[in-house]
């Protein structure tokens, strides 16, 4: 009943790095799937509203696909450790 240390270290590092990178990935996806923002400026009695477009917007057709990236990322974070853990379990 010998437990290999390399796969366990790999799992721990994989999960920690994966969790650490989820925030930035989600932030970038939100940035490229947002077409722009509305800005309202109030000066005295005059209110001006304008739309500021996002130059990094990927378009409405691609935004649907790009919005799925965090979901697939989470699936990889779940499936890879599960497969490695299953292989470790079957070796014993």
Curated annotation (Swiss-Prot):
GO CC annotations, alphabetized: membrane; viral capsid; virion membrane
Transmembrane segments: 8-28, 65-85
Entry similarity comment: Belongs to the fuselloviridae capsid protein VP1/VP3 family.
Membrane topology, from the record: Multi-pass membrane protein
Name of the gene: VP3
Organism from which the protein derives: Sulfolobus spindle-shape virus 1 (SSV1)
Disulfide bonds: none
Keywords from the named record: Capsid protein, Membrane, Transmembrane, Transmembrane helix, Virion
Family annotation (InterPro entries): VP1_VP3 (IPR009379)
Single GO term (MF): structural molecule activity
Cellular localisation: Virion membrane
The protein's name: Structural protein VP3
